[in-house]
Amino acid sequence: MPELPEVETSRRGIEPHLVGATILHAHIRNGRLRWPVSDEIYRLSDTPVLSVQRRAKYLLLELPDGWIIIHLGMSGSLRILSEALPAEKHDHVDLVMSNGKILRYTDPRRFGAWLWTKELEGHNVLAHLGPEPLSDEFNGEYLQQKCAKKKTAIKPWLMDNKLVVGVGNIYASESLFAAGIHPDRLASSLSTEECDLLARVIKAVLLRSIEQGGTTLKDFLQGDGKPGYFAQELQVYGRKGEPCRVCGTPIAATKHAQRATFYCRHCQK
């Protein structure tokens, strides 16, 4: 599933081609996604795009009378086309722009979403979200307050959007390795120093992935159709049985909430 760096990479890739241009029309080939494509999107015509924003893993296209909320789901991706290339099987949505560009949404598993809302505030998919991990609000003090009485393993807690948004399976594993914290540790067992380190490491890992264009494991592509390159820098994720790049111990794997977790038995305590 695309996580925060992949969604932010997509946002940065499509923004220059959309902002200041006008949506001439939308071509919906298959509107049966996780939720049906909103009727308002079918009716788009001569609609300027004012901004392209992100909240958690949602892309937000600001229009004069409302917002398009896009979620990439498990396997979705967005590409900017310079010409109307023939659509393939999983190309479900096109936004045809006044500048000759086409924003094409591809989603093999159809678990993404294209929704319309008049106002963002209070929308059910955006309500109750925690802070952005790259914001000043997310820091060691905040993390310690939220972990202090939490009797659950730190790995799944990091992936809870009520704590912090956008830290999915890949980056939770990578951040815990970088901080030297075992994923099975109870959140409440983390010290002040560990919470401070973990908050800083999460920011650093996410920023590095954004710089590399995200992590391409299977379906994710950047806005220009190129893969992300952070996969080449993964320290533990997807490396079960391979030697730790720091100490040589074979990388171990376990599961939290049915999600694979990767870690080093020697480096993480």
From Swiss-Prot:
GO annotation, biological process: base-excision repair
Question: Its function?
Answer: Involved in base excision repair of DNA damaged by oxidation or by mutagenic agents. Acts as a DNA glycosylase that recognizes and removes damaged bases. Has a preference for oxidized purines, such as 7,8-dihydro-8-oxoguanine (8-oxoG). Has AP (apurinic/apyrimidinic) lyase activity and introduces nicks in the DNA strand. Cleaves the DNA backbone by beta-delta elimination to generate a single-strand break at the site of the removed base with both 3'- and 5'-phosphates.
Stretches annotated zinc finger (FPG-type): 235-269
Residues annotated as binding DNA are H90, R109, K150
Quote the cofactor binding remark: Binds 1 zinc ion per subunit.
Alphabetical UniProt keywords: DNA damage, DNA repair, DNA-binding, Glycosidase, Hydrolase, Lyase, Metal-binding, Multifunctional enzyme, Zinc, Zinc-finger
Tell me what reaction this enzyme catalyses.
Hydrolysis of DNA containing ring-opened 7-methylguanine residues, releasing 2,6-diamino-4-hydroxy-5-(N-methyl)formamidopyrimidine; 2'-deoxyribonucleotide-(2'-deoxyribose 5'-phosphate)-2'-deoxyribonucleotide-DNA = a 3'-end 2'-deoxyribonucleotide-(2,3-dehydro-2,3-deoxyribose 5'-phosphate)-DNA + a 5'-end 5'-phospho-2'-deoxyribonucleoside-DNA + H(+)
Cite the Gene3D superfamilies for this sequence: 1.10.8.50, MutM-like, N-terminal (3.20.190.10)
Q: What is this protein called?
A: Formamidopyrimidine-DNA glycosylase
Which top-level group of life is the source organism from? Bacteria
Provide the assembly information: Monomer.
